Each structure stands twice: as C-alpha cells, then as structure tokens.
Curated annotation (Swiss-Prot):
Belongs to the NPIP family. May associate with the nuclear pore complex. Widely expressed. One of its GO terms (cellular component) is nuclear membrane. This is Nuclear pore complex-interacting protein family member A1. The gene is NPIPA1. Transmembrane segments: none annotated. Keywords: Membrane, mRNA transport, Nuclear pore complex, Nucleus, Protein transport, Translocation, Transport.
C-alpha cells in the first residue's frame, strides 16, 4: 500500500493497476527477506520528502512486511536468490529427501502387503490341495483344520526332538559319571598294586620260603665239606630233623635286619661237623665207598651239584623212612683229610 502511494506521489498522480503490480513484483522478486538497504526507491522517497515522521513510518512498515514475508513464504517459490543452479540444487535436495522418506514408507508398506499376500496364497494352496486330496474320499476340509493338524504334528515332533535331546544329554552325563568312577577305580587299583608290591618287596625270600633256602645251602656245604654224594631228599630230611624246632617265620612287621633266618651259614658250622642225631636207627651201616674217602671231591666249577662218576659206580642202598636216616655221619678221617680253604670261608661269611 505504501509503495503504491509513494509511486503515485512521484509520478504526479498517475494511478494505474499495472504500475502497482509491477512494483510489487519487483520488490517480491529481487528483495525478498531482510535486505534493508537494497531498495533505491526508498532512498529517493526519504531524500525528496524531507519529512522525518514519514520516513520512520515507511521504514517501520517495510520492516513489518519483510518480517511477515520471511515467516510466511510466497507461493511462487522464489527464495530471493539470483543463482539458478543454487536454487535448483536446493529444490532437488529437498525433493530427494522427501522422495527418500516416501520410498521408505512405501517399502515398509509393500513388505507388509507382500507378507499378507503370501500367507493368503499359501492358505489358498493348502485349501486347494486338501480339497483335491479329500475329494476322492468324499471329504472336504478347510485350511484351518489342516493347519491345526500341521501345528499339532510340529508340536509333537518338537516334543520328541526335545525328549531325544534330553535323553542324549542325560546319557552323556551318565557316561561322564561312569567314566569318572572308572578312573577313580583304576587309580585305586593302581595304588593297591603299588602297596602290594611295596610290602612284597619288604618280605625277604627266606620269610617266603623259610626252609628250602637254608636246607639247600646247608646241603651244598655238607656235600663240599664231607665229600659225600649229593642226595637232596635224604640231606634235606636229615638236616630238618637235626635242626629241630625253629622259630616261626617273621611277619611283615619284623624288619630285614631282625630276621632270624639268614642265607649265610655261621662260621662255627663250617668248622665243626654236624652233631649225631639223638635217635639211632637201623641204617648205621651206611658208609662212604673207599675210593670216595681216599680222594676228597673238589668243588664243581659251575656248581650244578652233580654226583661224580666214580661215586656212581657203587650204587647206594635204598633209603629208609626219613625218621630212620637221622644218623648220617661224616667219617672223622674225611674231616681230618679235608684241606683248609680260607677263601671259601671268607666267601661264606660274606
């Protein structure tokens, strides 16, 4: 309105609708927004009017109009920029943002519709299949019943799979427990065997066989010292009766040092012959052959306790029961004629 009045005053009162429209269009096209110093006609009005109040009112009205145009944009789409490319970029950016938002909504809606359509098509296929199958038997089912049965079957299958998995887990736990028990049992067995081996090693061989070892050693020494042929049964029984009552074999609680049965023969038994038995028997005429008495038998090299061939020439008489053969004596001439071997005595002592 003020623009029209100023134009009419400058032009001398000519008033046309076309001139007012041109002025409004130019102001709206070139100077939209907060461009306060770019209006040449405003400077012309302030210079020629020379009125302070009119200039203040004109500036105030212009500020109000610019503020209102800034808040409420015009419909023609002009943003006050003369750069066509910049305006095109801005418009394209806004249009692309809007298109992006719209496309996301469209895709979301399309997915929902597609899901519904697929479910409906599947339902129609199931209904058609069931109806075609049951048409032969004179039956007709709906898709809901078939789906219900399918869901029941799926539930039963899932329940069976769950039970099988639980059984497998329980079986694995049981096998693990059994394996643990087996390991514990094997460890206990190994400890028991080690303990048995330890106590078995602590028992001396003489404690395991208290009579055989000493009888054999005594028989060998008797054979070497007397020169008699080695007769194991006769010598063993004779020595057993001559030794008389012996203490019981030591148990595991006794130590090896305190063992009364030793594998060594005392030195006094090597020097002196065995004493005669208390009970004389009828076999007192058992004598050594003359050829064996003249030459003492040397000890064998391999110590295999074999009878010399010269002693095999004269057969020995049959032996009586063990109780009768207790008077086995060594002739004194054989004892006197035996050479003294200190090395053998040292070995026997060791």
């Amino acid at each position: 309105m003020f623009c029209c009045l100023g134009y009419e005053w400058l032009s001398g009162g000519c008033k046309t609708w076309h001139s007012a429209w041109v002025i409004n269009t130019l102001a709206d096209h070139r100077h939209r927004g907060t461009d306060f110093g770019g209006s040449p006609w405003l400077l012309i009005i302030t210079v020629f009017l020379r009125s302070y109040k009119f200039a203040i009112s004109l500036c105030t009205s212009y500020l109000c109009v610019s503020f209102l145009k800034t808040i409420f944009p015009s419909q023609n789409g002009h943003d006050g920029s003369t750069d066509v490319q910049q305006r095109a970029r801005r418009s394209n950016r806004r249009r692309q943002e809007g298109i992006k938002i719209v496309l996301e909504d469209i895709f979301t809606l399309w997915r929902q519709v597609e899901t519904k359509v697929r479910a409906k098509i599947r339902k129609m296929k199931v209904t058609t299949k069931v109806n075609r199958h049951d048409k032969i038997n004179g039956k007709r089912k709906t898709a809901k019943e078939h789906l219900r049965k399918l869901s029941m079957k799926e539930r039963e299958h899932g329940e069976k799979e769950r039970q099988v998995s639980e059984a497998e887990e329980n079986g694995k736990l049981d096998m693990k427990e059994i394996h643990t028990y087996m390991e514990m049992f094997q460890r206990a067995q190994a400890l028991r065997r080690r303990a048995e081996d330890y106590y078995r090693c602590k028992i001396t061989p003489s404690a395991r066989k208290p009579l055989c070892n000493r009888v054999r050693m005594a028989a060998v020494e008797h054979r070497h010292s007397s020169g008699l042929p080695y007769w194991p049964y006769l010598t063993a029984e004779t020595l057993k009766n001559r030794m008389g009552h012996q203490p019981p074999p030591p148990t595991q609680q006794h130590s090896i040092i305190d063992n009364s049965l030793s594998l060594k023969t005392p030195s006094e038994c090597l020097l002196t012959p065995l004493p005669p038995s208390a009970l004389p028997s009828a076999d007192d005429n058992l004598k050594t052959p003359a050829e064996c008495l003249l030459y003492p038998l040397p000890p064998s090299a391999d110590d295999n306790l074999k009878t010399p061939p010269e002693c095999l020439l004269t057969p020995l008489p049959p032996s009586a029961p063990p109780s009768v053969d207790d008077n086995l004596k060594t002739p004194p001439e054989c004892v006197c004629s035996l050479p003294f071997h200190p090395q053998r005595m040292i070995i026997s002592r060791n």
